[in-house]
Amino acid sequence: MKEAARWFLTRSRSGTWRSHVVLSGVLLFMCWQFAGPPPTFPLSSSYRAFQDISPDEGAWAVFFGLSGLQGIAGTLPVLERFYAVRVTSCAVLAAVHTVIGGLFWMGSPASIGSGTFLLWGSMALGNLLWEPRQCPPS
């Protein structure tokens, strides 16, 4: 237990690790939003592009859930030795956040879409800016 606490405290000082966890949490929130009632699509025109790709909100929930869990897995100590896996995890999260930003922008470019695109785009960029000295190759 003491070793686990030490591991967590060491990692939680890393801005990269914290952002990885938070950005993965955002995807899990999107999973929850699409999975539960009421349906999300009728609530906002910003979701129009999501609906055009697939009107099944359950499919979107699975997509966001798997992406978020993959991101959380990238923070686990088991993968700490595999630098390429961690970098890939960061890249996948960045790609998913960029796609989400683009879909929000296409769904409602005139109103909330552009601001939402910038928000999601900046989250994507933030996830690519990991600190190599804290993720040394083994």
Where are these regions (language model features)?
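Hydrophobic alpha-helical transmembrane segments and adjacent interfacial helices
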Residues: 28, 32-34, 72, 93-107, ...
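A loop-to-helix transmembrane entry motif
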Residues: 20, 47-67
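Cytosolic juxtamembrane helix and N-cap/initiation of the first transmembrane helix
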Residues: 1-29
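Membrane-helix boundary connector in multi-pass membrane proteins
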Residues: 80, 84, 95-117, 131-132
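Juxtamembrane helix-break-helix junctions at the cytosolic face
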Residues: 69-85
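Membrane-water interface at the C-terminal end of transmembrane alpha helices
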Residues: 121-138
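Membrane-helix interface motif
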Residues: 31-44
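Membrane-interfacial loop-to-transmembrane alpha-helix junctions, especially the N-terminal start
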Residues: 18-20, 81-91
